[in-house]
């Protein structure tokens, strides 16, 4: 059974492969910045780490052999689709790797709903670049709430370096007034938040 100790081991293995001398349990900025793209056809220890992470996440790469073949490519492609990127390739990049080497779930968990999971996928697709790839487990929690605020801050034009995912003075001052008939991404985010608060609305429109 996968636990944090296994995830920490995979993170440290990645750091060793990246040449980081002082390894740690975290997937921090140095690990993120040094993490390369790993593409189909690659071989070696980095591929072992990808394959191990996929097995831990419940995706079958069809082998633990250090070869980024069709099995690994297909598994990563399925993982990306579950994250909210249905048309992405099956190659690995640092954003996907960070989410892979984590305990976050990207399939529906007990107690979750398909409506919330769909919103989580949409938030990842539109706003992960302002934060990170977040769970798509169907559960409305603190992480999802933070992602909603990051999305709002991106739409407000707050620079990524200043975005916090928290509801502070700058976010309050820039928050727009919405009126009946408005159609924009702010309305879309309001619809997402409305579903999170237990109301049934169509999230596939921005009106």
Feature names for model-found ranges:
Residues 1-207:
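Cell-envelope/ECM-targeting effectors and their regulatory/trafficking segments
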